[in-house]
Amino acid sequence: MKKRFLNGIGYGIDGYCCEEGDRQRAAGNKKINYTNIAINGLLFKYKPTNAEIEVDGQHYSYKKVWLAPSMNGRYYGGGMIATPAQDRLSKDRLLSLLLFHGSGKIVTLAIFPSIFKGKHIDHPKNVEVKTGHRIKVTFDRPVALQIDGETVLNVKTYTAYKE
């Protein structure tokens, strides 16, 4: 399956939030609160995955990945500054990959709100940003993916690149 995106591909808790929002909407809930979905997901429902990452041929392994969006822009999800240094208009045509990993629920909940000011990157033990022309992310189990806010279910791997 090949899909194009303008801003970002989200894999992890953001994909879960889009999936749960779609489920609630289908059940007739017209007022979807993504903040509540995220908190409830982080505390009770979403389980982090392990990931194999490839950025321009360099390989990395991560445990307990909560969030791994590949971004063309820097903002997504209602004002989160996922990749503060990302410039979608730069001549180098790089994408950025945010990796939020390695923490338990409480630490994740403590750090997560700082994403709205782009300050989550001040936690290098749990948050990394990698840049490259081609990014491949493979998780140890299928989960929901969001592409510019639209949900795609049961995805285990994705590759992002600029044409």
Describe the role of every protein-language-model region:
Residues 1-163:
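Long C-terminal subdomains/extensions of small-metabolite kinases
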